[in-house]
Structure formats: C-alpha cells, structure tokens
Amino acid sequence: QEIIKGHVTLGSLRVRQDYLLAEGLLAPYAEDGSVPEAMLDFALARIRQLAAHELGHTLGLEHNFAASADGRASVMDYPHPYVILDAAGEPDLSQAYTTGLGEWDKRAILLGYQHFPDGVDAAAAREQIVRDTYAAGLHYVADVHSRGDAFAVSAGPAHPLGSLWDNGSDP
C-alpha cells in the first residue's frame, strides 16, 4: 500500500496575473465600465490547468516541454495561452488553456502506476508502454533538455520541441 501526500499552495496573485494578461489582450475599456466575462474565465482556466500541473508533480510526473508540440498533450508543460482571432479580428480567449489531462499524462500515469499480475514481466510490460506511447506520436523533453541543468553539463534549451512557454507544433 502506498500513501501519497502533496501540499500545493496557489496564491491569489497568480489569478490576478492571468486576469491582467487577459486585460492586456482584450483591452476592455468600454465607456460603461463593464468587464468581459472572458477575462475571469481566462484566469480561472489557467489556475485549473496549473492546479492539475502541480497535482501531477505530487504523483511523480516531471515536466514535459514537448507536450505543446503534441497538441497540448500534457498539463506538465508550461503552456503559453492559445489565443486566436475571431471572424471580426478580435482576440478569442476561449481555448487559451486546455481542460483535463492530456494523452501524455495518461500514459505517464499508466507507466508509473500500472500493476502487473504475477507472471507478467513488469520491465518488459513497462517497456511496451513506452514504445506504444512513442508510436502514438507523443514526445517527451525533460527540464535538462529545455532549460539546462545547474548540476550537469547541458546544452540548455537546445531541443526544438522543448521550448518553455510556447504553444503549437511549429518549433
């Protein structure tokens, strides 16, 4: 039996910061003083994504900075908000942050927590999970290959799929 405990604190300044990002994108300076609901939705979507990210750490998941190149396949990436322009040329924040776990997250949890019955070669079964994950087109780029490592010799952010704060498949 395994007991997992994680303690994560997400301060209100994070929500405020994302609210201000939305304000900068939307410039909602209407004469009547109204504020678009999209600003709060944007900020709350980010805090939900961040909460899932931090919970992932409590489960043992590391950052995966290639997930943004794989269609937002993991909450363990550092996502830049995905903002598009609507038909009128106005910023649309409705898809800024994804909801739920990504495919990479599900595969990583399967790898780390799958119980194999007696008689099954667990090492071979885990290797097959990894092979199937990569065969599905998912990638993994760790911290050391995205931003370097203070404790190892590293080329730093040299991997084309491992940029922090990006979004999309074009490295």
Language-model segments: residues:
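Aromatic-residue detector
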Residues: 15, 60, 116-119
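Alpha-helix termini
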Residues: 14, 18, 66-69, 73
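Conserved catalytic/binding loops enriched for acidic/polar residues
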Residues: 70-171
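Catalytic Zn2+-binding segment of zinc metalloproteases
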Residues: 55-70
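Poly-acidic low-complexity segments
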Residues: 9-11, 48, 64, 167-171
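Metzincin-family zinc-dependent endopeptidase catalytic domain
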Residues: 1-58, 83-85
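Flexible, active-site-adjacent loop/turn segments at secondary-structure boundaries
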Residues: 2, 6, 63, 73-74
